[in-house]
UniProtKB/Swiss-Prot annotation:
GO molecular function list: nickel cation binding; unfolded protein binding
Record's protein name: Urease accessory protein UreE
One Pfam match: UreE_C
Source organism per UniProt: Rhodopseudomonas palustris (strain BisB18)
Similarity section: Belongs to the UreE family.
Main location per the UniProt record: cytoplasm
Function: Involved in urease metallocenter assembly. Binds nickel. Probably functions as a nickel donor during metallocenter assembly.
GO biological process: protein folding; protein-containing complex assembly; urea metabolic process
Amino acid sequence: MIRATSVKGQHRWSEAAADTVVLDFDDRHRRRTAMVGTRGLQFLLDLEHAVALRGGDALVLEDGRLVEVVAAAEPLIEIRGSDPKELVRIAWHLGNRHLPTQIMAKGLRIRRDHVIEEMVQGLGAKTVEIEAPFDPEGGAYAPPAEPSHDHAGHDHAHDSHAHHDHDHGKHAQHDHGKHDHAHHDHAAHDDHHVHDEHCGHDHHGHGHEHK
């Protein structure tokens, strides 16, 4: 099986992609795993270190071909406060519970969880259930961003949406709506979010982890 051994960051490549992989937040945090593109290309992601992939990145195959990474839409809750102070207070409570949180210009996004949604509403915020790519903060202990060069094994900061127009085809849906906030140590990939821990959730599709 051909391997993908390095990553090109968003806006650092312009070639036509040989295929596309549509991945949710968890599946974008891998070091070594088998993947299948939307057009059927099978390959092994085999990086030196786990990388926080973003939508618009490209995985570089051994033969030089590229596979574009697209961030899959996930069931999320968007939190909107009446003022910045209220949002900061809510963000503190979310961080205190080790919840991955995406910071928006005028709100916060977390994975859909009705218990947390009720807590946030009790703090005075408004919530809206949405389907969107999830790109939470990397956390204080995440490696520094390195967007200026191609890399294998480094995180990078840029927008979570793909930058090419094409048909992504059918892909597995990921339902992270129900979870119990248990914290797991995923051996095959690093955590890259607030407090560097994940809430418990299932992984579906995109092959199996290889140790």
